Amino acid sequence: MISVNDFRTGLTIEVDGGIWRVVDFQHVKPGKGAAFVRSKLRNLRTGAIQEKTFRAGEKVAKAQIETKTMQYLYANGDQHVFMDTSSYEQLELSATQIEEELKYLLENMSVHIMMYQDETLGIELPNTVELKVVETEPGIKGDTASGGTKPAKTETGLVVNVPFFVNEGDTLVVNTSDGSYVSRA
C-alpha cells in the first residue's frame, strides 16, 4: 500500500479493479476543510484517462508491473510482433492495444513491454526516437527570421512541426510523450 501523498508521475496503482498510471497529480490544501490530492490517471488496459480525487493520507495498492525488454519485429495485418531479446519468444499485440505508440515504432526498435500477472498491458517507448522525414515543403531562404515552423511527415506517418531548415531525408529526434521536434540527429 502507498499513501496518495507519495504520488509521483508514472506511478502505477490499483484502484476500483483497474490498473492505472498516474499521469498528473496536485496536492490541494484548501483554507477550510481537509487536504486532498487531485489526480489524472490512465487506465493501462483501456487507455482511458480519468480524473480522481483522493483524501490526503488515503492508501491505495501499488501495482507490481513487470517490464520486459523486447524488440519490435514487424506488423502482421492488425497484429504487431515483438521478440524477447533474451529468450527469443515472440509476442503479438493488436493495433488497438498500442494505438498511440504505433506512430513512433520502427522495425528492430527496443521497447519495454509492461506485464501485470502474465497480462500484457502495453509498451513503454524511449523518451525520444529518431525518425526520417519523407515529406515536407522546401525551406525558402530568409524564412528563418520569423522562427516559424512547417509540417513534416515522417517514415511512420507522424506529422511533426519542424523549423524551416529541415529538409526531406533529414533524421529528426522526436519526443515520444508529445510528438514534438527536439533536434536533427
Swiss-Prot record:
Which top-level group of life is the source organism from?
Answer: Bacteria
Family annotation (SUPFAM superfamilies): Nucleic acid-binding proteins, Translation proteins SH3-like domain
Q: Which of UniProt's keywords are assigned here?
A: Cytoplasm, Elongation factor, Protein biosynthesis
Keyword check for Lyase? no
Q: In which pathway does it act?
A: Protein biosynthesis; polypeptide chain elongation
The GO molecular function terms of this record are: translation elongation factor activity
Summarize the record's disruption phenotype note: No sporulation at 37 or 47 degrees Celsius.
Return the InterPro entries for the record: Elong-fact-P_C (IPR015365), NA-bd_OB-fold (IPR012340), Rib_uL2_dom2 (IPR014722), Transl_elong_fac_P/YeiP (IPR020599), Transl_elong_KOW-like (IPR013185), Transl_elong_P/YeiP_cen (IPR001059), Transl_elong_P/YeiP_CS (IPR013852), Transl_elongation_fac_P (IPR011768)
Signal sequence annotation:
none
Biological process (GO) annotations held by this record are: peptide biosynthetic process
GO cellular component assignments? cytoplasm
Q: Does the keyword Disulfide bond apply?
A: no
Where in or outside the cell it occurs: the entry states: Cytoplasm
User: What is the role of this chain?
Assistant: Involved in peptide bond synthesis. Stimulates efficient translation and peptide-bond synthesis on native or reconstituted 70S ribosomes in vitro. Probably functions indirectly by altering the affinity of the ribosome for aminoacyl-tRNA, thus increasing their reactivity as acceptors for peptidyl transferase. Plays a role in sporulation.
- Family classification: Belongs to the elongation factor P family.
The molecule here is called Elongation factor P
